[in-house]
């Protein structure tokens, strides 16, 4: 290492580059110099907009009404085409085909795999809304199943509740340490909530969530934005 440093010193001691030399080199080779974008280290706290009890009740009542229509003679397939919010199955009467365990969310799977054939379920609540399920056939560990999904339509009250929660969190943060704590306690982003909400180094010109990149652009270092809807 010492020999290498001595050899390097001998070479560089013979090099005499002035500031004007550097400036001229830059001007003459500006198109050859790669561009390195400014990167911003950013953190966030995500509060998802979730349906209130009122919204959940409205969705449940709608699914009950659809079940009533079917019990009164409306074909399941027609009900799915008219009412289902599942774009992947509604046009085929809600048919999901033969499916094994492990495909559906646990609430749907538990109901579907314990049902008798050709029985219409009560509304089954999942993260997606409420489902009406009908099992057509069983073959080994697979079932042929169809469903009608009624999604929770988020209301202005749902959005207001989420806004008030995130705004209250913001007002309680007085230091970067507090930001870390609040991210761990409240953030719904499970990819970084235990890491202080760290998003990493962001190129705001190419970041996929424009609302966030636009906010970063206008923020000073170590300041917290107002709540942003994405």
Regions found by a protein language model. Name each.
Residues 1-230:
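Peptidyl-prolyl cis-trans isomerase
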């Amino acid at each position: 290492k010492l020999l290498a440093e001595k050899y390097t010193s001998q070479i560089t001691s013979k090099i005499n580059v002035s500031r004007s030399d550097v400036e001229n080199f830059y001007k003459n080779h500006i198109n050859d110099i790669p561009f390195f974008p400014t990167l911003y280290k950013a953190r966030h706290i995500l509060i998802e907009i979730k349906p209130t009890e009122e919204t959940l009740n409205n969705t449940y009542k709608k699914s009950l009404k659809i079940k009533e229509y079917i019990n009164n003679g409306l074909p399941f397939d027609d009900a799915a085409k008219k009412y289902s919010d599942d774009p992947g199955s509604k046009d085929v009467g809600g048919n999901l085909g033969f499916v094994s365990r492990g495909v559906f969310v646990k609430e749907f799977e538990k109901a579907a795999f314990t049902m008798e054939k050709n029985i219409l379920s009560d509304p089954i609540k999942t993260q997606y809304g409420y489902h009406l399920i009908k099992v057509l056939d069983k073959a080994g560990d697979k079932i042929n199943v169809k469903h009608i999904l009624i999604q929770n339509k988020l209301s202005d009250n749902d959005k207001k509740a989420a806004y008030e929660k995130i705004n209250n969190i913001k007002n309680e943060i007085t230091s970067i340490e507090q930001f870390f704590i609040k991210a761990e306690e409240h953030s719904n982003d499970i990819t970084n909530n235990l890491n202080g909400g760290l998003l990493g180094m962001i190129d705001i010109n190419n970041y996929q969530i424009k609302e966030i990149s636009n906010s970063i652009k206008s923020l000073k270092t170590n300041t917290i934005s107002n709540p942003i809807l994405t």
